[in-house]
Structures are given as C-alpha cells and as structure tokens.
C-alpha cells in the first residue's frame, strides 16, 4: 500500500515527551478568557458544561483560535462513526502517563468543543481530541495533528451526514495535505482503507468490523468485494493479522496489520502485551488495540501505555451501573446499525432490555436505520420499546418477531420491567436525557 510502519515505541522519547508551547497573543488570550467566562456562566445557570458556548465565543472573537491554541502541542485526533468517545478516553489514559493533556472528555467534538478543551488546559503539551468525522478535515487543517486515529466509517444521521463515500474522500484529501501526520487506521474497514489512501505514515490495526453493510461493494470502483469468510466478521473476534482478508479486483485490499490481537494480547512484529480492557465486548478489544497503537505513535512506551488502559471503566456514562430501587441498570449507547452490531455481543441474554430511541437533530431525524439492526438476535428476553420514537421502534421489533411492550416514557418503561439486572440501550439524546433524569431522581431521594 506504499506506507511506512511506525515503530511501537513511537518517536524518540526526548523529542516527544517535552513538547514546547507557544505563547498566545494578547487578543487570543482575551478571546479565551471570554470563552471561559461564558462557559462558567452556562454552568452557573445549569445550562450544561458550557464547552460549546465557551468555544463558540472564543472562535467568534478570534477565528484562528483553534490553530493558535493547538500550536506547539502533540495533537491526537480521534475520529470515526462509532467508538470515538471510548477510544478517546483510552488514549487519554495512556498519554497521561507521560504528561498533562487537553482532552474533550465530554464528547463535544466539533470546532467549538475542541477550542474549549484546548482552552481548559492551556499549558498541556499534549492534546487527545475526539472529532466528528464530518469536521475532521477542517480541524486537521487547523491543528496539523501529530496523529489521526480513524476507527470506522459507516452511515449515521442520514439527514445530516453526506454519503459515506463522500466523507471518506474528504478525509483522504485532508490527509494528503498532512504527509507528516501518522494515521492509525482500522485495516478491517474497507471505507477507512479507502479514506487513508496513500498516506505515507499509516499504522494499520486489525481492530475489527462488526458491521460491513455499507461496503459490500468497493468504495473506490463499485465492484463486489471478496471476503475470505462467509460471515464477513473480521478483527479481534476473528482472523487476527491475516487469516480473514478482503480485496477488490481494482487493487484495493486489506493492508497487512501492524497491530493485531491474538489470545487476548496486543501484538506487533516485535511487541506482545496483555490487553487488559475493563470495558465489555469484542468491540472494545478493537478500541483498545487502536488506543494502544495511537499512544505509541505519540511517543508513549508500549509497556507503559498498556496498563493505563485498565483505568477506563466508564466513558461519559456509558457502561456505568446505576442502582434504581430493586433494579440494577447497565447503561449502554448505540446510535446506528454499526453501533448495534457491536452492542449485540455485549448484551447478556436473558437480561431484560429497555431500548430508547429519540430522533432529534443530534440523533438524526430519519429512523429508517432501525430496519438494518438485527433485532431478531434479541429473542428470549423481556423487551420494552421507549423514547420519542417508541412507536417506530415497536413496529421494527414486531417485524423482528419480538414480544415487547411499548412505553414512551423511559422511567415508566423501567417500571414495566422486572427487578434485578436490566440492560438499557439508548441513542444519543435519549441516553443523555435518561442520565439526567436518573441523576435528578437520586438527588431528590438523597
């Protein structure tokens, strides 16, 4: 593929572990202070974390603030359709072992959120930043990242996002403008491989692809891709480095991975490390090996990065356990067919299941994606459909042959489920709203 492997140990430690920060000009400093004040006011008024409004104010006063705040830092941009927030937290845990960092832990992943994260840590020499895939090109041009992490590319928010192939093409053009950037990319996702193109510093990772519904045909030429196994499941749960490949007659093919998973260990040609991820499911093994490869690319020694990944158990409320009366809720997020494909390996039969679907702007108004989720695999457990689009979800569950109840209000839906363990899977705004309601409920009781 014309790429150069970056060694597991990353760049020379002396060059990487002591990044130098440039001093900001007085106008940028004033813009940052105005943004911080706006964020503080937002929090004081109970309007949220303030990261979006704070970044927006800073950018309104200085449209070059993102570039100026990033200058002199070792910046890692983490992007893709699914797994950004989790992988971002895993990389941040590893990078913290070598120095302070800026980190958009809340998941505010567009320009205003990125500016706010950088402004909150003005002296940090590192930045580990989640970026919405639609905004990756513009943010990469502004910050000139040391590392770009590309997890996967699938359909999401059909009314907001353009066609996946167009997103991949935009990313490919952006990466071509940054030839010195290390691109840590998922070799198992044909759309990602197409997006990386001929980037000269690619590190390929066998991170898995639980959903390939958007790439039955080649992203480049449109011909049918050939997979070496019938169920086209590759990566952590399958063929490791090279047993389960894909290719097209045009020449686009799965690159030979530089990192892969074998018997629960992260492997390179010269590295073998236990991959101790405390997040559930095969999908998080893939996120873990992506995080480890990325941390090494920014200069963290592999044997120092790997143990740090164990620190991550909850990610912005995801995977958290919440006790509510006699129920124990496990909070999970899935927002598109690819996310659900990975989630199915995490759900524990016959644990009762609450599925909550909204369709606001942040979720995407179009819920037709529900028909691509294999809900048929959720049989033999109590299921309740909830959320603002509970009726749409209920229709899909009926066609899947699942006995279920439809209860629009999530708290009322929980009351319809038995005591004990309950898995809760919600899309973005439904997940956020339920967390807030449960928090207010606990505060009122205690």
Residue map of PLM features:
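Buried hydrophobic packing segments
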Residues: 91, 95, 114-118, 288-298, ...
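Short, surface-exposed amphipathic charged segments that create phosphate/polyanion-binding patches used
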Residues: 118, 164-165, 214-225, 416-423
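Adenine nucleotide phosphate-binding catalytic loops in nucleotide-utilizing enzymes
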Residues: 9, 13-24, 203-337
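A generic structural signal for short, well-ordered alpha-helical segments in conserved domains
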Residues: 88-92, 292, 394, 435
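ATP-dependent carboxylate-amine ligase
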Residues: 1-51, 55, 71, 222, ...
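Residue-level signal for inorganic ion chemistry
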Residues: 130, 151, 184, 287, ...
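Phosphate-binding loop of NTP-binding sites
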Residues: 10-12, 16-206, 211-216
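Short glycine-rich anion-binding loops that position phosphate/pyrophosphate groups of nucleotides
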Residues: 83, 132-134, 153-156, 188-190, ...
């Amino acid at each position: 593929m014309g790429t150069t492997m970056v060694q597991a140990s990353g760049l020379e430690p002396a060059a990487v572990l002591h990044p130098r920060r440039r001093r900001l000009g007085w106008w940028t400093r004033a813009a940052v202070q105005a943004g911080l004040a706006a964020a503080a006011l937002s929090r004081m008024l109970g309007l949220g974390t303030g990261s979006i409004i704070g970044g927006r104010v800073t950018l309104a006063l200085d449209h070059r603030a993102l570039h100026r705040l990033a200058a002199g830092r070792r910046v890692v941009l983490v992007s893709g359709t699914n797994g950004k927030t989790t992988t971002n937290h895993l990389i941040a845990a590893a990078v913290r072992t070598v120095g302070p960092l800026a980190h958009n832990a809340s998941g505010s992943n567009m320009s205003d959120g990125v500016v706010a994260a950088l402004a909150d840590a003005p002296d940090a020499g590192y930045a580990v930043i989640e970026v919405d895939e639609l905004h990756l090109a513009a943010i990469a041009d502004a910050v000139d990242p040391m590392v770009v992490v590309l997890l996967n590319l699938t359909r999401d928010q059909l009314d907001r996002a353009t066609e996946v192939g167009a997103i991949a093409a935009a990313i490919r053009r952006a990466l071509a403008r940054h030839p010195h950037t290390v691109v840590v990319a998922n070799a198992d996702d044909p759309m990602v491989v197409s997006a990386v193109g001929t980037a000269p510093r690619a590190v390929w990772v066998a991170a898995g692809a639980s959903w390939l519904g958007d790439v039955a045909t080649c992203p480049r030429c449109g011909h049918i891709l050939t997979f070496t196994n019938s169920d086209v499941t590759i990566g952590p749960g399958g063929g490791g480095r090279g047993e389960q490949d894909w290719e097209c007659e045009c020449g686009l093919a799965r690159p030979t991975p530089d990192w892969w998973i074998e018997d629960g260990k992260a492997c390179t040609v010269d590295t073998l490390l236990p991959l101790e991820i405390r997040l559930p499911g095969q999908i998080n093994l893939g996120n873990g090996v992506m995080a480890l490869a990325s941390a090494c690319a920014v200069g963290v020694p592999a044997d120092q990065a790997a143990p740090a990944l164990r620190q991550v158990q909850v990610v912005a409320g995801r995977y958290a356990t919440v006790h509510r009366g006699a129920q124990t809720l496990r909070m999970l997020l899935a927002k598109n067919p690819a996310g659900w494909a990975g989630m199915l390996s995490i759900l524990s039969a016959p644990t009762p299941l609450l599925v909550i679907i909204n369709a606001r702007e942040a979720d995407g108004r179009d819920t037709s994606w529900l028909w691509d989720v294999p809900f048929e695999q959720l049989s033999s457990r109590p299921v309740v459909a909830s959320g603002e689009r509970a009726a749409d979800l209920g229709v899909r569950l009926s066609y899947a042959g699942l006995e279920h109840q439809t209860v629009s209000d999530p708290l009322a839906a929980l009351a319809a489920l038995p005591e004990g363990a309950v898995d809760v899977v919600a899309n973005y705004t439904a997940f956020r709203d339920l967390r807030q309601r449960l928090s207010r409920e606990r505060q009122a009781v205690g």
